[in-house]
Amino acid sequence: MDTIIYKQDLATPAQLLKSGQVVAFPTETVYGLGANALDKEAVKQVFAVKGRPSDNPLIVHVESFEQAKKYIQTLHPLAEKIVQQFWPGPLTLIFEIIPGSLPQEVTGGLTTAAFRMPNAKLTLDLIHQAGVPLVGPSANTSGKPSPTCAAHVYHDLQGKIAGIVDGGNCQVGVESTVLDLSNPKAAPMILRPGAITREMLADFLGIEILLDKHLVKESETPKSPGMKYKHYSPNTPVMMVQPENLAKAVADLKAQGKKLGLLASPKQLVGLNAELVLAYEDESVEAATKGLFAGLRALDEQDLDLILVTTTAETGLGQAYMNRLKKAAAQKIYEV
């Protein structure tokens, strides 16, 4: 199968999606692997292409809240308010759905489903032209760093999917926040941190927002992507390091003969020497979050023994950054 890159033409990829093909598309978070969410055979292809476990539910991408409502059984009393403030955007909402309205391949066999309206005009136009909602897990081989440009998708999935809609680089760089609204009588709970932070939601709604940190058991079906399976890991081992320990870590590991790649902010890298050094765009957590997956992919293409990545405080957007970094590093951190 030839994988075609589309830059302006949306009619062709929309037709491919209508006919049950798999097409990757851009969003503000990461690139998604698109298929008709109402076509279970198309959805099965997404799992096969990614090598994704079948009990890991998929997010349904819609062009409007009205489109999502066709499948939702019960609306949380805060749903409309949240949607008006944060959609389109990097926020996924989980609702109880009308039984049988979506294939169980989409829901992981649960009575709930996750919906998002991406803040990407190209993708909203694609959904509109396809005429159906689209599933859209990250368009990469399962377990690897998520793709933030079309080249990342092509690297992982060329020859396996019909096409890629190229919308340039993703602006956020990590997957959406997932907020559970499935119980109308319960307070909203974050199941996966992202760019819409716990603090943003709490400030807007005037209530405490909980963050679900429990580890999903092997026998349990996760309610949201990102809760159960190993994610975001390059082939080269990754180790976290606190910024103040970076220089010592480099010296110690180089003394052991390790070939190192470093991923950190420009100031953190001043004066350090390693086989390959990659800096985020600036010192902000936004830059670190945007550059994390792309940096891991770039360093993984080199002949390195270890990738060192600096940590940040787990507040605001730092929660999303550290959530992905901890998984990429399998929780390993350099100890002084």
Predicted regions and their residues:
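Active-site-adjacent structural elements in enzyme catalytic cores
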Residues: M1-V336
